[in-house]
Amino acid sequence: MKVFILALLALTATTAIAQLETTCSQGFRQYQQQQQPGQRQLLEQMRPCVAFLQQQCRPLRMPFLQTQVEQLSSCQIVQYQCCQQLAQIPEQIRCHAIHNVVEAIMQQQSQQQRQERQQQAQHKSMRMLLENLSLMCNIYVPIQCQQQQQLGQQQQQQLQEQLTPCATFLQHQCSPVTVPFPQIPVDQPTSCQNVQHQCCRQLSQIPEQFRCQAIHNVAEAIRQQQPQQQWQGMYQPQQPAQLESIRMSLQALRSMCSIYIPVQCPAPTAYNIPMVATYTGGAC
C-alpha cells in the first residue's frame, strides 16, 4: 500500500511539473528566438519569478478516498518555475529584474502592512527569502546592480513577466495541497519550488547587461499594484524602503538561483512599467 501511494504521489508531481513546463515554454519561445530580447518578452519570462516571490500558489486536491493529508503544495511548483525562469534571464539584466519584483510586491501590500513594526518584520522576512532564493535556484544574483543601459518599455515588461514566479514565492502566497489518503501524512514539495526553478532559468537567459534593470522593473511593477496613497513619499527610486526591497530581492535571487547579477544598477527613473498580473499557479 505504501509503495502504491508513493508511486501515485510521484506520478502526480511529475505530471503537474510537465504541464507547467509545457505551458511556460510556449510563452518563452519568442524570446529565445531573438538575439536581443524585447522588454515584453523578458517580462513574460520573469512571470514565474513574480509568482514565486509573491507565493500566490493555489492548493491542489485529488478527489479519492476520504481522509485528506497534506501532500503537494502548488508553491513548490511555483518555486520550480521561478528558478527555471530566473536561470533563463541573461546575467546582465537579472539585477533589475529582481528589483522590479520586490517593488511590485511592496506595491501590493495593504496600508496596515506598511506600519513601521510590520514593515521591519517584512523586510527581515524578505531578506531571508532573498538569501534563500539564490541557494534554492543555484543561480547567482548580486546584492546590488551595476550601472546598466536603459531598456525599452517592451524589454522592461518582458523582464517583469519573467520574474512572476519569484514574486509569488517571496510574498509567501503559497497554499498547501491536501490529498485524501487514509491517515498517512506525507511531506512533499510545493508548486512554489517548481516556479522557483523556472524563475532561475528565465533569469539566467536574460543577457547580463539587462538583468539589473529587469529585476528593477519587476519590483516596480509589484509596487505599482498597491494604491498610491499607501506609497506616499515612496515613489522615488532613491527612497530607503524601495532601495531596501531591491537589495533584499537581489540577495534572494542571487542565492536561490546561483546566477550572476551586477552589484549595482541605475534607478529606474525613466521606467514606465505596466502592472504584473497575479500568478495563480496554473499558468505562467
From Swiss-Prot:
The keyword Transmembrane does not apply. One of its GO terms (molecular function) is nutrient reservoir activity. Residues 1-18 form the signal peptide. Contains disulfide bonds. Pfam families: Gliadin. CDD domains: AAI_SS. SMART domains: AAI (SM00499). The keyword Transmembrane does not apply. It comes from the Eukaryota. Keywords: Disulfide bond, Seed storage protein, Signal, Storage protein. Belongs to the prolamin family. PANTHER family: AVENIN-LIKE B5, PROLAMIN PPROL 14P. Seed storage protein. Might be integrated via inter-chain disulfide bonds within the glutenin polymer. This is Avenin-like b4.
